[in-house]
Amino acid sequence: MDKLTWYGHGAMGLELGGHQVLVDPFLGGNPAASITPDKVPANFILISHGHGDHVGDAIAIAKRTRATIISNFEIANWCQAQGAPTTHAQHLGGGFKHPFGYVKLTLALHGSALPDGSYGGNPCGF
């Protein structure tokens, strides 16, 4: 059975067809989070934009779980440069059939600078 778990702020976990999908995994330092970055399961991590409270613990979680990070081109490249083992870049309006389901990036109106100040590309919804 598919399941959604809200971890506070924009962070959530989805169990879809046996795959663990994290969205905007801001867990460490998030007082609402019911799980820590070293315990959360993940096969895929979706990042909507570059702000630290959405990129959150994505790199550490991806390194620990070998999860694929899915985001826009700029964020996917930044994550790879930070040591994420696998990324999948998509562009706004484009979609891709992942093992857990189809993901299409939609436009979001928001900032997207990454934690180190570099350009995070266009923010997106999924």
Model-derived segments and spans:
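Short, polar loop motifs at secondary-structure junctions
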Residues: 8-9, 71-77, 91-93
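Histidine-/acidic-rich catalytic cores in large beta-rich domains
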Residues: 86-91, 104
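Catalytic core of the metallo-beta-lactamase
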Residues: 7, 12-16, 97-126
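Mobile, glycine- and charge-enriched loop segments
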Residues: 63-69, 122-123
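Extreme N-terminal starter segment of soluble prokaryotic enzymes
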Residues: 1-5
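Pre-active-site segment of Zn-dependent metallo-hydrolases
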Residues: 13-51, 56-63, 74, 111-119
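Catalytic phosphate/metal-binding cores of nucleic-acid and nucleotide-processing enzymes, i.e., regions
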Residues: 44-46, 68-70, 82, 87, ...
